[in-house]
């Protein structure tokens, strides 16, 4: 699963070509999430008809597929809803039948795009096959539109003409697992429903004129007396839907459709404003509206400035220019609405600009992003760190008996890099956990634990599951994320926003260094009351202020790295990376980048573990990259490097400027050194990892690998 996008226009005329272009552009904005197929669904030539176009390969292949149909792209639509999807094969292999959107039947009565995993799809599929439904794909998603059709047909037979969101609620009750989905139907023209549970969805809102909109009320569904009830006895005997008396006439479909009249009979506005009055309609008619739906707010930046984030168990229903949000779980009064938020994304930040690709752009942006994460937070004159997002939990955080950092992939490496400074400054046990393993083990969590959750997207599925687990255990939770409206930022008690900006390349580059600094700042802030650590804190704070300029110096190594990749590295397919102390995390992150981007086998090794059978492979002369910057472990690391040189290993050494210990070996051609500026030990990893980012990048370029979309790599698996 990967990217979802949808577009709805109401009383704003768009041609079919414009609608297709909008959907395609939305998918292209999601290309940074690796995918292997794509598809769209739009209205056909008739009012109650839907067409599906999908193809394996890149989005360009989808565009070619659409062009084969010779569609009338000048056909105007005053109102229309279209949905689109990019897919990374999970359930079901890479073939056209498995691409999204999926339909309920050959006439496309219901069409669905979906992110997530339906865990009971096998049971649903067996039930629907027994009812005569024919499945064309191997996916779990296909059971959703067919379930829509079955429940809809059954309700019609029983005399019930359901509203779209009521029908959706009945379908969702049958689904187990996670989902972020959009559904359109020929029975509900110009309408779309969006549902979220464990997979993100955001809705962009745009009026033809400016709107003063602050929030959208949530309409909670009654759990005791629902519109229709599923009878467990008849369900087990093969009947999916058993009708109970309808209590509320409001659940029934309005007739005639408001859409055909362009009038509204409701006395209340769907949107709620700062005052109790509605925004006046234009010329007595409903307000012309556009809605953009996506699994990632970054794809909405070019279209809207106001967005609504759906919460778990929310169902959004868009029709007649209105947005209604329903929730299947009763919430507190504090959560009886969804805030309309300003989208804080600049379009220029999601374009490549003068760079060849996004990865190169994001490597070079680290001079600026490291400033951004510290801006207004690090005061070099008073030697203080101020984190306003944590202030309300100051007492609880400083009473922590244990700190647990939980993350996945590169975010996990940033936690490992920051762990030693937490232990040193806080003087409490500090654990670093892989989110998936943490949940699998049902770890012991106590109320006096502080759990820090790190994720660049804020939507990492495993990390969110770990967060929910810790909340149930009543631990204090901190979020370190880049996306302010993400699930982790909303569900944690407090947090730090890294202010990194969009990162569209698959490889984590600028997010890693920003997370690293954010974690160091948290350690400095939490230890402020420890008098014994004052001088150490001053040293780190002063060093933080010059990190951005030092990164600029490191980037000047690029010409040397290009030459190194061209002459020495590109012919190899195995690499060893050595590090110790703070630099073991750098070795892990560097090895991860080389696997992910350069398609080479790379292994990170603790330096002193070199003698445990690892030296046996150095005779085959794989490139060995060693981190040997000055710190407490420098003498031991130097000894290990000497052993490598004795065995003709020819290592590449990342060391500090002016470090002359290997000068003679360098002159003999036994070693290559990449010299980086020296900083305090706990921050050295920020500078040391950048040469590895550049090596990974240029190795990939030399091999003609698309660095922004490497194979078999995804930020979402289903949602990382």
From Swiss-Prot:
Its EC number is 2.6.1.16. It comes from the Eukaryota. It is an enzyme of class 2 (transferase). InterPro entries: GATase_2_dom (IPR017932), GFAT_N (IPR047084), GlmS/AgaS_SIS (IPR035466), GlmS/FrlB_SIS (IPR035490), Ntn_hydrolases_N (IPR029055), SIS_dom (IPR001347), SIS_dom_sf (IPR046348). CDD domains: GFAT, SIS_GlmS_GlmD_1, SIS_GlmS_GlmD_2. The active site is at residue 2. GO terms for molecular function: carbohydrate derivative binding; glutamine-fructose-6-phosphate transaminase (isomerizing) activity. Residues 266-285 are annotated as: Disordered. Keywords: Aminotransferase, Glutamine amidotransferase, Repeat, Transferase. It catalyses: D-fructose 6-phosphate + L-glutamine = D-glucosamine 6-phosphate + L-glutamate. One of its GO terms (biological process) is UDP-N-acetylglucosamine biosynthetic process. This is Putative glutamine--fructose-6-phosphate aminotransferase [isomerizing].
């Amino acid at each position: 699963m990967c990217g979802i996008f949808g577009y709805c226009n109401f009383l704003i005329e768009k041609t079919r070509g414009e609608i297709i272009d909008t959907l395609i552009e939305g998918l292209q904005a999601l290309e940074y999430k690796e995918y292997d197929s794509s598809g769209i669904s739009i209205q056909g030539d008739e009012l109650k008809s839907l067409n599906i176009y999908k193809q394996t390969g890149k989005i360009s292949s989808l565009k070619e597929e659409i062009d084969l149909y010779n569609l009338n792209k000048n056909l105007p639509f005053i109102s229309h809803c279209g949905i689109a999807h990019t897919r990374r094969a999970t359930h079901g292999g890479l073939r056209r039948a498995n691409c999204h959107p999926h339909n309920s039947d050959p006439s496309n009565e219901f069409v669905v795009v979906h992110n997530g995993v339906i865990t009971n799809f096998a049971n649903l599929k067996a039930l629907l096959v027994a009812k005569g439904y024919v499945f064309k794909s191997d996916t779990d998603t296909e059971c959703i539109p067919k379930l829509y059709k079955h429940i809809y047909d059954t309700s019609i037979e029983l005399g019930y003409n359901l509203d779209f969101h009521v029908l959706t609620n009945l379908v969702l009750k049958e689904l187990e697992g996670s989902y972020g989905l959009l559904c359109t139907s020929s029975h509900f023209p110009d309408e779309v429903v969006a549902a979220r549970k464990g997979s993100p969805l955001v809705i962009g809102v745009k009026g033809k004129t400016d709107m003063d909109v602050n929030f959208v009320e949530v309409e909670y569904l009654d759990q005791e007396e629902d519109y229709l009830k599923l009878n467990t006895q008849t369900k087990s005997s093969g009947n999916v839907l058993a009708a109970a008396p309808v209590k509320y006439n409001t659940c029934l479909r309005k007739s005639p459709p408001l859409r055909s009249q362009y009038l509204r009979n409701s006395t209340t506005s769907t949107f709620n404003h700062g005052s109790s009055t509605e925004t006046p309609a234009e010329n007595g008619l409903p307000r012309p509206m556009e809605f953009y739906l996506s699994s990632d707010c970054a794809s909405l930046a070019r279209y809207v400035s106001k967005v609504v984030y759906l919460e778990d168990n929310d169902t959004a229903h868009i029709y007649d220019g209105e947005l209604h949000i329903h929730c299947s779980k009763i919430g507190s009064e504090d959560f009886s609405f969804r805030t309309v938020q300003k989208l804080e994304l600049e379009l220029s930040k999601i374009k490549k600009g003068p760079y060849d690709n996004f990865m190169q752009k994001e490597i070079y942006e680290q001079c600026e992003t490291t400033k951004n994460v510290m801006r207004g937070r690090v005061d070099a004159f008073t030697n203080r760190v101020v984190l306003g997002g944590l202030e309300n939990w100051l007492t609880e955080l400083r009473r922590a008996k244990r700190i647990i950092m939980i993350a996945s992939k590169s975010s996990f490496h940033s936690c490992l890099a920051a762990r030693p400074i937490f232990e040193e400054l806080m003087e409490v046990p500090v654990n670093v956990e892989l989110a998936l393993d943490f949940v699998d083990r049902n770890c012991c969590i106590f109320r006096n634990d502080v759990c820090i959750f790190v994720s660049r997207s804020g939507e990492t599925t495993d990390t969110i599951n770990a967060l929910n687990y810790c909340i149930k255990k009543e631990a204090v939770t901190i979020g370190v994320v880049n996306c302010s409206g993400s699930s982790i930022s909303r569900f944690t008690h407090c947090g730090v926003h890294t202010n990194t900006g969009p990162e569209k390349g698959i490889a984590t580059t600028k997010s890693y260094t920003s997370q690293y600094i954010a974690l160091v700042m948290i350690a400095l802030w939490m230890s402020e009351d420890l008098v014994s650590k004052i001088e150490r804190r001053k040293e780190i704070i002063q060093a933080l202020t010059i990190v951005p300029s030092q990164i600029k110096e490191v980037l000047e190594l690029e010409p040397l790295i290009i030459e190194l990749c061209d002459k020495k590295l590109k012919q190899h397919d195995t690499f060893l990376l050595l590090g110790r102390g703070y630099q073991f995390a750098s070795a892990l992150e560097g090895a991860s980048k080389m696997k992910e981007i350069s398609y080479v086998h790379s292994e990170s090794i603790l330096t002193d573990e070199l003698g445990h059978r690892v030296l046996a492979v150095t005779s085959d002369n794989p490139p060995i990259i060693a981190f040997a910057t000055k710190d407490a472990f420098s003498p031991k690391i130097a000894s290990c490097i000497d052993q490598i040189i004795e065995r003709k290993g020819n290592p590449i050494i990342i060391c500090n400027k002016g470090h002359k210990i290997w000068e003679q070996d360098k002159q003999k051609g036994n070693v290559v050194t990449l010299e980086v500026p020296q900083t305090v030990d706990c921050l050295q990893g920020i500078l040391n990892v950048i040469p590895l980012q550049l090596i990974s990048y240029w190795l990939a370029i030399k091999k003609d690998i698309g660095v922004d979309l490497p194979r078999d790599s995804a930020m979402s698996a289903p949602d990382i």
